[in-house]
Amino acid sequence: MSGHSKWSTIKRKKGALDAKRNKIFTKLIREISIAAKMGGGDIDSNPRLRLAINKARVSNMPKDNIEKAIKKGIGDNTGAEYFELTYEAYALHGVALIIKCLTDNKNRTASEVRSVLSKNGASLGAPGSVSYMFHKKGLISYSLDKYPEDEIMELALEAGAEDIYSEGSQIEVITSAETFEAISSVLRTKFEEDIAEIALLPENKISLNKEQIDKVLSLIEKLEDFDDVQEVVHNLEIIDEID
């Protein structure tokens, strides 16, 4: 399961959180508001809102900010329309990228994404040129400082988890996208997760040297600095010294 682990990426993002807190919060607030606008403010009947709130909590967003974002979404009568866009691209050294965007201006987003890619040696791919390298899975992560590994594994397997991966102080439970809600609900009866999301996990990862990794990560960070970009998924293997 080590080939699928996102934990090195998660650690990298957490390490950069303080410097980019405002920008991260802006993206999360937008996602929460739109989820509430589309499906209402009840997390029990709105899975998208539940996942968005979970991401916000992992990023240490204050509860008050989350509640304001929900209220904003529910009460949004401005008629502003947001679009979800996904771009597939190749970075240097054949690293595959899936760029998820949320925007009220498709042309602006397309132009900016293309510009960042071209200036950093990357190229936009046709739909399907990259996505086949990833699989949509449920990802649930727990801290082993809080819970015994064997208890999490036992309940996860009983609930129907596809795979389990542990490293250091973290354990990840992998599910199918279809069974994610059911399995996470079972696990939530005993354990509080650090992360619970539907994620695109790479079938295989590309290993590069430190200099090459730095260049690819620089591109990813430039894409993530653009407000319309919500997430950049990749198949790069992050080595320890990069974290």
Curated annotation (Swiss-Prot):
Main location: cytoplasm
Alphabetized InterPro entries for the sequence: Integrase-like_N, TACO1_YebC-like_2nd/3rd_dom, TACO1_YebC_N, Transcrip_reg_TACO1-like, Transcrip_reg_TACO1-like_dom3, YebC-like
Domain of life: Bacteria
Pfam family, one: Transcrip_reg
GO annotation, cellular component aspect: cytosol
Family membership noted in the UniProt record: Belongs to the TACO1 family.
Name of the protein described by the UniProt record: Probable transcriptional regulatory protein BH0025
UniProt source species: Borrelia hermsii (strain HS1 / DAH)
Higher taxonomy: Bacteria, Pseudomonadati, Spirochaetota, Spirochaetia, Spirochaetales
